[in-house]
């Protein structure tokens, strides 16, 4: 049976879902953050980039933060029709602000549902409780059960984007348009693609990779082999995602 390990630490909370002794989901909750996925907030429109499609909204910053701090801004897509500059819009944050090592990226938001109530996102503990898997609380001063389950290796993989599997490796490369997963290895094309598909599916779920994800597999021999590769990816990703078939060039997109 799958089980959560949960630790409430200083400045961060950690959770790891184990199934059969293997980590299948990792979550890290870091404080503080002005815009977090799931927040429903009233934000002011400061720029209309494409009327009816895209704009930039800003949360009023506290007195000790400059009003131009991009950590308090989000890209709103779609922008509601007839929205004007300086108007207030109720939005839901779908991605926190991130820095990819080159560019600071604003948070992403979408219009909140008509019945949405302003408020902060559910805490990590609340989210994992909603999964109905049992939770084992790990005390910060006791044995580090998360470390024993491979936490440091998971963090290293997330930071480097490099994941090894028998017969090859994955390189996970975030870009402004999508997340790209590149495959390299020494098996024959069909075997490498299938092994990579299983590893990629696990990685997408483990790291919670969302948005548009493109996997570049080696070109496999036939349509049946491509279907096996696509099925292996989706088996690892789990429910809730949609994907294209693997095309003749070995490319698959997951949304």
State where each predicted segment sits:
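DE-rich acidic low-complexity regions and acidic surface loops
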Residues: 1-255
């Amino acid at each position: 049976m799958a089980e959560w390990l949960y630790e409430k630490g200083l400045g961060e909370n950690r959770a790891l879902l184990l199934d059969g002794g293997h980590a299948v989901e990792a979550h890290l909750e870091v404080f503080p953050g002005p815009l977090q996925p799931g927040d429903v907030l009233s934000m002011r429109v400061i720029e209309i980039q494409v009327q009816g499609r895209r704009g930039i909204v800003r949360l009023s910053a506290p007195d000790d933060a400059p009003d131009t701090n991009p950590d308090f801004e989000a890209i709103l897509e779609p922008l509601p029709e007839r929205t004007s500059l300086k108007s207030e819009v109720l939005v839901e944050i779908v991605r926190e602000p991130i820095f990819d090592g080159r560019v600071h990226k604003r948070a992403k938001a979408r219009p909140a549902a008509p019945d949405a109530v302003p408020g902060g996102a559910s805490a990590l503990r609340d989210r994992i409780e909603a999964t109905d898997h049992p939770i084992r609380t790990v005390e910060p001063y006791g044995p580090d059960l998360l470390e024993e389950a491979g936490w440091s290796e998971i963090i290293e993989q997330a930071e480097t984007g490099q994941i090894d599997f028998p017969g090859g490796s994955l390189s996970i490369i975030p870009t402004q348009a999508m997340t790209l997963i590149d495959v390299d290895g020494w098996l024959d094309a069909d075997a490498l693609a299938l092994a990579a598909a299983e590893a990629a599916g696990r990685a997408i779920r483990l790291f919670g990779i969302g948005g548009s994800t493109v996997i570049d597999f080696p070109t496999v021999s036939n349509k049946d082999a491509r279907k096996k590769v696509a099925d292996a990816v989706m088996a690892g990703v789990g429910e809730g995602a949609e994907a294209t078939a693997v095309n003749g060039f070995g490319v698959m997109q997951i949304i």
